[in-house]
Amino acid sequence: MFGGWRLVVWQIFSEIITRRLGFWICLYFAALSVGMISGSEPLVRTRHIQNTHTVPINRSPGSLRAWQAGSTYVFGRQGGVITYSWPPHDRPSTRVDRLALGFSTLMEDATLVRVDSSAGLGDYLKLHIVKGNVVAVFNVGTYDINIEEKAKLVNDGNYHIVRFTRSGGNATLQVDDLPVIERFPPGHIDSHRLGTGRLPYRRLVEESLPKNGRQLTIFNSQMTIRIGGWQKQQVSGFQGQMSGFYYNGLKVFSMAADGDPNVRMEGSVRLVGELQSSSTPHGGATVYQSSVTEISSTTSNTITITYSTPADEQQTTDELLVASAECPSDDEDIDPCEPSSGTLCCFVPPAGPTGPAISSFPGPAEVFRESNGTTGMVVGIVAGAALCILILLYAMYKYRNRDEGSYHVDESRNYICNSNGAALKEKNTADDDSGSKSKKNKNKEYYV
């Protein structure tokens, strides 16, 4: 017996209780785990294009807002220039350069941007318009290398996006949604390599072409970025609108709008702001907003940037995002690494103005409602589980007390009945003995 119960009954009942308690306990902890997981998820989820062996690029909700319009500047008829200057002890030397910007103009010849190295080195990168065509030219110590897009004129007053990439002596150029143009100069054996976009600060001067005929690749000690091309001695500066400027991680227009001390503006340059009007100088060019940017980086060093531009919004963006690739060594100072199978094509053409709209990320109200719903669900599950456990314990307590009481009452009654029966039996036996003795004595006296 165990607590007034038979041992077999107790074992069966305890097994049932254990199963039920285990089920509710598991349900309770599962609810807690669901609540913790839901609470730890980021409030903003980013979209990525999935390719083979993709490497995700995490984006902070506060810093990379690619769906918002960027700063736009208007360069007047008198010409103007926006200049960014690196600090003297922080001038980068790069093997890979990436440049992207959007503009609208009616000029047939104009300089869009020029990047120069420190005095005496002679390295430079220039993007300009020649007879209505976009031309990129650079020199990293060997000779001038040109790459030009002749299939489309850009001096029509419409908004155009230009993307340029340099990897050593190789280069790519893309205007709007046209095919990417690639340029591989002779004498360069590393036609498929992409290096790290920034090297530690040091004075890397490439004096002459090596004897083996290799193309020099380092853009040494970059000093200034001049946007607009205007100079006081010249009057043929850029005239029109320009937005979304990006160069090796620098968003110069946003920095200028924020009052960065390294950015200086001269001439006829003014900030339009976040919301750009549909009318532009010299004939009303239309500027579309790049509403979302999606990035994926593969192991073959292919970086994709996709734009969706709805026609009903007249905004621009300077959130053109890129990523560096492999092989951090310097061609001129360190043994070359193994060539990879990557390509130089780094961008996907933007979608047309009739592309589907991309839904924005959830606002604070939606996030707050979702958080409240999750909290309420967890609290409800926990409260229900606790109530079920209390009811089960109360039922066990009542059932146990009822069984023990009936058992003790029955036992006491059986004991009393047995004792009374024994006493009665003894009394009857004694009476029979005394009666027989008296009868015998009486008979004996009678006969005597």
From Swiss-Prot:
The entry's keywords: Cell adhesion, Membrane, Signal, Transmembrane, Transmembrane helix
One Pfam family matching this protein: Laminin_G_2
Membrane topology category: Single-pass type I membrane protein
Keyword Ribonucleoprotein: no
GO annotation, biological process: cell adhesion
Biased composition (Basic and acidic residues): 426-436
Cytoplasmic topological domain: 397-448
GO cellular-component term (any): membrane
Subcellular location: Membrane
Segments for region (Disordered): 426-448
CDD domains, sorted: LamG
Residue span, Laminin G-like domain: 71-269
General function of this protein: Neuronal cell surface protein that may be involved in cell recognition and cell adhesion. May play a role in formation or maintenance of synaptic junctions.
Protein family membership: Belongs to the neurexin family.
Protein name, as recorded: Neurexin-1b-beta
Gene from which this protein is expressed: nrxn1b
